[in-house]
């Protein structure tokens, strides 16, 4: 496995894109990942009861706690990573549009808990 392993992280403010993203990743052979509910820091600070907001502005918003979906997926090589990000960015959503979310990847030095055989299956 001469290539590096990466973790792909996508924070989706628009949850409606999640299923399409998962379908596209699966088509590329990326079948493992973890999805968690998350909240952005700005949202959390705005909803914090201890921070005063002028004129009860907080009450304008019926649902203060909106959640994002954050996807973490280990990807075995740079080629698959680039394809995954390109397909999602080009066919499903544009992370450059305000309010969509963010996507980034980080090289991973050590992976413990996933046997090498399972990492190889990520490509197939």
Protein language model regions, located:
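Positively charged, small/polar-rich N-terminal and surface patches that mediate targeting and assembly
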Residues: 1-124
């Amino acid at each position: 496995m001469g290539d590096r392993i990466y973790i792909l992280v996508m924070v989706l403010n628009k949850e409606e894109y999640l299923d399409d993203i998962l379908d596209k990743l699966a088509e590329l052979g990326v079948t493992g990942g973890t999805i968690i509910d998350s909240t952005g820091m700005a949202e959390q600070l705005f909803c914090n009861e201890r921070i005063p907001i002028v004129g009860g502005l907080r009450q304008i918003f019926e649902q203060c706690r909106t959640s994002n979906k954050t996807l973490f997926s280990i990807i075995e090589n740079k080629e698959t990573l680039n394809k995954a990000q390109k397909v999602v960015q080009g066919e499903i959503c544009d992370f450059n549009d305000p309010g969509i979310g963010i996507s980034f990847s980080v090289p991973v030095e050590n992976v413990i808990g996933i046997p090498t055989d399972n990492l190889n299956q990520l490509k197939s």
